[in-house]
Amino acid sequence: MRLFAASVVMGCAVAQGLWAQDASSAKMAESVIKAWPAGVVTTENHPGEWAYEEGVLLDGMVAQWHATATGADFKYIKDAVDKYVTEDGTIKGYKADGHTLDDIEMGRAVLLVYRVTQQPKYYKAAKFLQEQLALQPRTASGGYWHKQIYPNQMWLDGAYMAEPFRAAYAATFQERGDFDDIAKQLLLMDAKMRDPKTGLLLHGWDESKQMPWADKTTGLSPEVWARAMGWYAMALVDVLEWFPKDHPTRADLVAALNRTATAAVAYQDKKTGLWWQVMDKGGKPGNYTEASASSMFVYALAKGVRMGYLPQSDEGVEIGRASCRERVCR
Protein backbone atom coordinates (compact mmCIF):
# COMPACT_ATOMS: atom_id res chain seq x y z
CA MET A 1 0.00 0.00 0.00
CA ARG A 2 2.76 2.45 0.92
CA LEU A 3 4.68 1.91 -2.30
CA PHE A 4 1.50 1.92 -4.38
CA ALA A 5 0.43 5.26 -2.90
CA ALA A 6 3.85 6.76 -3.51
CA SER A 7 4.14 5.62 -7.09
CA VAL A 8 0.64 6.79 -7.96
CA VAL A 9 1.24 10.26 -6.48
CA MET A 10 4.50 10.54 -8.42
CA GLY A 11 3.12 9.18 -11.67
CA CYS A 12 0.05 11.36 -11.67
CA ALA A 13 1.85 14.50 -10.47
CA VAL A 14 4.39 14.35 -13.27
CA ALA A 15 1.83 13.33 -15.86
CA GLN A 16 -0.46 16.20 -14.99
CA GLY A 17 2.49 18.53 -15.53
CA LEU A 18 2.61 17.29 -19.12
CA TRP A 19 -1.09 17.02 -19.94
CA ALA A 20 -4.06 19.12 -18.83
CA GLN A 21 -6.20 16.86 -16.67
CA ASP A 22 -7.86 16.68 -13.28
CA ALA A 23 -5.58 16.82 -10.27
CA SER A 24 -5.57 13.10 -9.52
CA SER A 25 -2.30 13.44 -7.65
CA ALA A 26 -3.83 16.06 -5.35
CA LYS A 27 -6.55 13.61 -4.39
CA MET A 28 -3.98 10.93 -3.71
CA ALA A 29 -1.84 13.32 -1.65
CA GLU A 30 -4.87 14.29 0.40
CA SER A 31 -5.62 10.64 1.08
CA VAL A 32 -2.01 10.06 2.18
CA ILE A 33 -2.17 12.94 4.67
CA LYS A 34 -5.51 11.71 5.94
CA ALA A 35 -4.31 8.12 6.34
CA TRP A 36 -1.01 9.02 8.04
CA PRO A 37 -1.42 12.51 9.55
CA ALA A 38 1.57 12.15 11.88
CA GLY A 39 3.97 11.90 8.97
CA VAL A 40 5.04 8.33 9.73
CA VAL A 41 3.68 5.72 7.37
CA THR A 42 2.21 2.85 9.35
CA THR A 43 0.20 -0.20 8.39
CA GLU A 44 -1.17 -3.13 10.35
CA ASN A 45 1.69 -4.87 12.15
CA HIS A 46 4.13 -2.25 10.84
CA PRO A 47 4.73 0.70 13.19
CA GLY A 48 6.70 2.76 10.69
CA GLU A 49 10.45 3.17 10.36
CA TRP A 50 13.22 4.86 8.38
CA ALA A 51 12.88 2.89 5.15
CA TYR A 52 12.64 3.26 1.41
CA GLU A 53 8.86 2.80 1.37
CA GLU A 54 8.32 6.00 3.31
CA GLY A 55 11.09 7.69 1.34
CA VAL A 56 9.37 6.93 -1.95
CA LEU A 57 6.07 8.14 -0.54
CA LEU A 58 7.77 11.42 0.38
CA ASP A 59 9.22 11.62 -3.14
CA GLY A 60 5.64 11.54 -4.36
CA MET A 61 4.66 14.28 -1.92
CA VAL A 62 7.65 16.35 -3.07
CA ALA A 63 6.53 15.98 -6.69
CA GLN A 64 3.06 17.11 -5.66
CA TRP A 65 4.48 20.06 -3.71
CA HIS A 66 6.57 21.11 -6.71
CA ALA A 67 3.42 21.07 -8.84
CA THR A 68 1.20 23.01 -6.42
CA ALA A 69 3.47 24.89 -3.95
CA THR A 70 0.96 24.02 -1.23
CA GLY A 71 2.35 24.72 2.23
CA ALA A 72 0.54 21.78 3.76
CA ASP A 73 2.42 19.40 1.48
CA PHE A 74 5.83 20.77 2.51
CA LYS A 75 4.84 20.69 6.18
CA TYR A 76 3.93 17.05 5.82
CA ILE A 77 7.32 16.27 4.26
CA LYS A 78 9.22 18.17 6.94
CA ASP A 79 7.20 16.65 9.78
CA ALA A 80 7.91 13.17 8.41
CA VAL A 81 11.65 13.85 8.21
CA ASP A 82 11.62 15.31 11.72
CA LYS A 83 10.27 12.04 13.10
CA TYR A 84 13.67 10.52 12.34
CA VAL A 85 16.29 13.30 12.17
CA THR A 86 17.26 14.53 15.63
CA GLU A 87 18.60 17.98 16.53
CA ASP A 88 22.20 16.79 16.22
CA GLY A 89 21.60 15.25 12.79
CA THR A 90 21.45 11.65 13.95
CA ILE A 91 18.97 9.42 12.10
CA LYS A 92 16.92 7.41 14.58
CA GLY A 93 16.76 3.71 13.78
CA TYR A 94 19.43 3.77 11.07
CA LYS A 95 21.40 0.51 10.92
CA ALA A 96 24.78 1.53 9.52
CA ASP A 97 26.30 -1.94 9.54
CA GLY A 98 23.62 -3.28 7.19
CA HIS A 99 25.05 -1.32 4.25
CA THR A 100 21.71 -1.43 2.48
CA LEU A 101 21.07 0.93 -0.40
CA ASP A 102 17.38 0.88 0.52
CA ASP A 103 18.13 3.01 3.57
CA ILE A 104 19.71 5.78 1.51
CA GLU A 105 16.52 6.62 -0.40
CA MET A 106 14.84 8.76 2.26
CA GLY A 107 17.85 11.04 2.18
CA ARG A 108 16.24 12.79 -0.79
CA ALA A 109 13.54 14.20 1.46
CA VAL A 110 16.20 15.22 4.00
CA LEU A 111 18.07 17.14 1.30
CA LEU A 112 14.88 18.85 0.15
CA VAL A 113 14.11 20.04 3.67
CA TYR A 114 17.70 21.26 4.05
CA ARG A 115 17.56 23.25 0.82
CA VAL A 116 14.38 24.96 1.98
CA THR A 117 15.23 25.55 5.65
CA GLN A 118 19.06 25.60 5.66
CA GLN A 119 18.97 24.04 9.13
CA PRO A 120 22.28 22.30 9.98
CA LYS A 121 20.72 19.11 11.32
CA TYR A 122 19.43 18.18 7.88
CA TYR A 123 22.83 18.80 6.33
CA LYS A 124 24.45 16.57 8.96
CA ALA A 125 21.97 13.77 8.28
CA ALA A 126 22.47 14.03 4.52
CA LYS A 127 26.25 14.09 4.93
CA PHE A 128 26.06 10.97 7.07
CA LEU A 129 24.20 9.15 4.30
CA GLN A 130 26.73 10.32 1.73
CA GLU A 131 29.53 9.00 3.93
CA GLN A 132 27.69 5.70 4.26
CA LEU A 133 27.87 5.28 0.51
CA ALA A 134 31.63 5.79 0.62
CA LEU A 135 31.74 2.66 2.79
CA GLN A 136 29.37 0.61 0.63
CA PRO A 137 30.90 -2.72 -0.49
CA ARG A 138 31.44 -3.04 -4.23
CA THR A 139 31.68 -5.76 -6.84
CA ALA A 140 34.90 -6.40 -8.73
CA SER A 141 33.62 -4.08 -11.48
CA GLY A 142 32.95 -1.30 -8.98
CA GLY A 143 29.19 -1.68 -8.65
CA TYR A 144 27.50 -1.26 -5.29
CA TRP A 145 26.39 -4.40 -3.48
CA HIS A 146 22.69 -4.01 -2.86
CA LYS A 147 23.14 -4.96 0.80
CA GLN A 148 25.83 -6.38 3.05
CA ILE A 149 23.94 -9.68 3.09
CA TYR A 150 23.84 -9.83 -0.73
CA PRO A 151 27.55 -9.97 -1.64
CA ASN A 152 28.62 -9.19 -5.21
CA GLN A 153 25.03 -8.50 -6.25
CA MET A 154 23.65 -5.46 -8.03
CA TRP A 155 19.86 -5.09 -8.04
CA LEU A 156 18.01 -2.64 -10.26
CA ASP A 157 16.22 -1.36 -7.17
CA GLY A 158 19.51 0.05 -5.93
CA ALA A 159 19.70 2.48 -8.83
CA TYR A 160 16.73 4.41 -7.46
CA MET A 161 17.59 3.91 -3.80
CA ALA A 162 21.01 5.54 -4.04
CA GLU A 163 21.74 7.44 -7.24
CA PRO A 164 19.10 10.23 -7.25
CA PHE A 165 20.13 11.09 -3.69
CA ARG A 166 23.79 11.09 -4.68
CA ALA A 167 23.06 13.31 -7.68
CA ALA A 168 21.05 15.77 -5.62
CA TYR A 169 23.77 15.85 -2.96
CA ALA A 170 26.53 16.34 -5.54
CA ALA A 171 24.65 19.20 -7.19
CA THR A 172 23.69 20.85 -3.89
CA PHE A 173 27.19 20.81 -2.42
CA GLN A 174 29.20 21.09 -5.66
CA GLU A 175 30.72 17.61 -5.42
CA ARG A 176 31.17 17.37 -9.18
CA GLY A 177 33.50 14.39 -9.04
CA ASP A 178 30.69 12.21 -7.68
CA PHE A 179 28.85 12.33 -10.99
CA ASP A 180 31.49 10.06 -12.56
CA ASP A 181 30.64 7.23 -10.20
CA ILE A 182 26.89 7.89 -10.34
CA ALA A 183 27.05 7.38 -14.09
CA LYS A 184 29.24 4.32 -13.62
CA GLN A 185 26.65 2.62 -11.40
CA LEU A 186 23.79 3.24 -13.83
CA LEU A 187 25.73 2.40 -16.98
CA LEU A 188 27.13 -0.77 -15.43
CA MET A 189 23.55 -1.95 -14.98
CA ASP A 190 22.75 -0.96 -18.54
CA ALA A 191 25.73 -2.94 -19.85
CA LYS A 192 25.46 -6.04 -17.68
CA MET A 193 21.75 -6.43 -16.88
CA ARG A 194 20.03 -5.66 -20.19
CA ASP A 195 18.90 -8.54 -22.41
CA PRO A 196 20.25 -7.67 -25.88
CA LYS A 197 17.35 -9.48 -27.58
CA THR A 198 14.45 -7.76 -25.80
CA GLY A 199 16.03 -4.61 -24.39
CA LEU A 200 14.54 -5.47 -20.99
CA LEU A 201 16.64 -5.47 -17.84
CA LEU A 202 16.90 -8.45 -15.50
CA HIS A 203 16.33 -7.78 -11.82
CA GLY A 204 19.63 -8.96 -10.36
CA TRP A 205 23.24 -9.53 -11.35
CA ASP A 206 25.66 -11.61 -9.30
CA GLU A 207 29.09 -10.78 -10.65
CA SER A 208 30.57 -13.76 -8.82
CA LYS A 209 27.96 -16.11 -10.38
CA GLN A 210 27.69 -17.96 -7.06
CA MET A 211 24.01 -17.48 -6.18
CA PRO A 212 21.64 -20.38 -7.02
CA TRP A 213 19.51 -18.07 -9.16
CA ALA A 214 22.45 -16.67 -11.14
CA ASP A 215 23.03 -17.77 -14.71
CA LYS A 216 26.41 -19.49 -14.77
CA THR A 217 27.51 -17.52 -17.83
CA THR A 218 26.03 -14.06 -17.28
CA GLY A 219 25.36 -14.01 -13.53
CA LEU A 220 21.86 -12.67 -14.23
CA SER A 221 18.64 -13.58 -12.47
CA PRO A 222 16.03 -15.40 -14.58
CA GLU A 223 13.10 -12.95 -14.60
CA VAL A 224 12.29 -9.44 -15.79
CA TRP A 225 10.34 -7.83 -12.95
CA ALA A 226 8.40 -4.74 -14.00
CA ARG A 227 8.85 -2.97 -10.71
CA ALA A 228 12.62 -3.52 -10.83
CA MET A 229 12.85 -2.06 -14.32
CA GLY A 230 10.58 0.76 -13.16
CA TRP A 231 13.05 1.62 -10.41
CA TYR A 232 15.81 1.86 -12.98
CA ALA A 233 13.78 4.02 -15.35
CA MET A 234 12.87 6.43 -12.55
CA ALA A 235 16.48 6.56 -11.39
CA LEU A 236 17.63 7.68 -14.82
CA VAL A 237 15.16 10.56 -15.17
CA ASP A 238 15.73 11.73 -11.60
CA VAL A 239 19.52 11.60 -11.87
CA LEU A 240 19.51 13.45 -15.19
CA GLU A 241 17.61 16.30 -13.57
CA TRP A 242 20.70 17.03 -11.45
CA PHE A 243 23.40 15.90 -13.88
CA PRO A 244 25.73 18.59 -15.31
CA LYS A 245 24.84 19.36 -18.91
CA ASP A 246 28.50 19.34 -19.91
CA HIS A 247 29.38 16.02 -18.26
CA PRO A 248 30.85 13.54 -20.77
CA THR A 249 28.57 10.67 -19.70
CA ARG A 250 25.29 12.60 -19.76
CA ALA A 251 24.56 11.52 -23.34
CA ASP A 252 25.19 7.90 -22.35
CA LEU A 253 22.60 8.16 -19.58
CA VAL A 254 20.07 9.70 -21.97
CA ALA A 255 20.73 6.85 -24.40
CA ALA A 256 20.20 4.29 -21.62
CA LEU A 257 16.89 5.97 -20.78
CA ASN A 258 15.79 5.81 -24.41
CA ARG A 259 16.67 2.11 -24.59
CA THR A 260 14.71 1.52 -21.41
CA ALA A 261 11.69 3.48 -22.62
CA THR A 262 11.65 1.70 -25.97
CA ALA A 263 11.72 -1.71 -24.30
CA ALA A 264 9.05 -0.74 -21.77
CA VAL A 265 6.69 0.48 -24.49
CA ALA A 266 7.21 -2.71 -26.49
CA TYR A 267 6.04 -4.84 -23.57
CA GLN A 268 3.14 -2.67 -22.38
CA ASP A 269 -0.19 -4.47 -22.35
CA LYS A 270 -2.19 -2.91 -25.18
CA LYS A 271 -5.55 -3.88 -23.71
CA THR A 272 -5.20 -2.40 -20.22
CA GLY A 273 -2.48 0.20 -20.70
CA LEU A 274 -0.54 -1.36 -17.80
CA TRP A 275 2.58 -3.51 -17.51
CA TRP A 276 2.76 -7.14 -16.45
CA GLN A 277 4.63 -8.00 -13.25
CA VAL A 278 6.86 -10.39 -15.23
CA MET A 279 7.21 -8.19 -18.26
CA ASP A 280 8.01 -10.72 -20.97
CA LYS A 281 5.39 -13.27 -19.88
CA GLY A 282 2.19 -11.29 -20.27
CA GLY A 283 -0.97 -13.36 -19.92
CA LYS A 284 0.77 -16.39 -18.45
CA PRO A 285 -0.92 -18.15 -15.49
CA GLY A 286 -0.08 -16.45 -12.20
CA ASN A 287 1.14 -13.27 -13.88
CA TYR A 288 -0.80 -10.02 -13.50
CA THR A 289 -0.72 -6.37 -14.49
CA GLU A 290 1.01 -4.45 -11.72
CA ALA A 291 -0.18 -0.97 -10.70
CA SER A 292 2.95 0.20 -8.87
CA ALA A 293 5.23 -0.73 -11.75
CA SER A 294 2.85 0.88 -14.23
CA SER A 295 2.93 4.11 -12.23
CA MET A 296 6.72 3.98 -12.26
CA PHE A 297 6.80 3.73 -16.04
CA VAL A 298 4.22 6.53 -16.36
CA TYR A 299 6.45 8.70 -14.17
CA ALA A 300 9.63 7.95 -16.12
CA LEU A 301 8.04 8.32 -19.56
CA ALA A 302 6.19 11.53 -18.74
CA LYS A 303 9.16 13.17 -17.04
CA GLY A 304 11.50 11.99 -19.77
CA VAL A 305 9.40 13.77 -22.38
CA ARG A 306 8.86 16.87 -20.27
CA MET A 307 12.59 17.26 -19.64
CA GLY A 308 13.50 16.61 -23.28
CA TYR A 309 15.26 13.27 -22.75
CA LEU A 310 12.66 11.32 -24.75
CA PRO A 311 11.15 12.40 -28.08
CA GLN A 312 7.85 14.27 -27.94
CA SER A 313 6.37 11.86 -30.47
CA ASP A 314 7.47 8.77 -28.55
CA GLU A 315 4.71 6.16 -28.48
CA GLY A 316 5.41 5.69 -24.80
CA VAL A 317 4.04 9.14 -24.06
CA GLU A 318 0.57 8.21 -25.29
CA ILE A 319 0.75 4.83 -23.61
CA GLY A 320 1.76 6.48 -20.36
CA ARG A 321 -1.06 8.99 -20.59
CA ALA A 322 -3.66 6.30 -21.24
CA SER A 323 -2.33 4.18 -18.40
CA CYS A 324 -2.32 7.04 -15.92
CA ARG A 325 -5.67 8.49 -16.91
CA GLU A 326 -7.69 5.36 -17.40
CA ARG A 327 -6.22 2.70 -15.16
CA VAL A 328 -3.97 3.94 -12.38
CA CYS A 329 -4.56 7.56 -11.39
CA ARG A 330 -8.34 7.35 -11.01
Locations of regions flagged by a protein language model:
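Aromatic (Trp/Tyr) and acidic
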Residues: 55, 62-70, 110-116, 152-184, ...
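Bacterial N-terminal signal peptides
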Residues: 5-17
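Carbohydrate-binding/catalytic loop surfaces
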Residues: 41-48, 59-62, 100-114, 144-158, ...
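Oxyanion-binding "anion nests"
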Residues: 231-282
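Long, well-ordered core segments of solenoidal/helical folds
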Residues: 22-41, 75-93, 124-143, 176-205, ...
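CBM-like carbohydrate-recognition segments
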Residues: 21-55, 64-107, 113-128, 286-299, ...
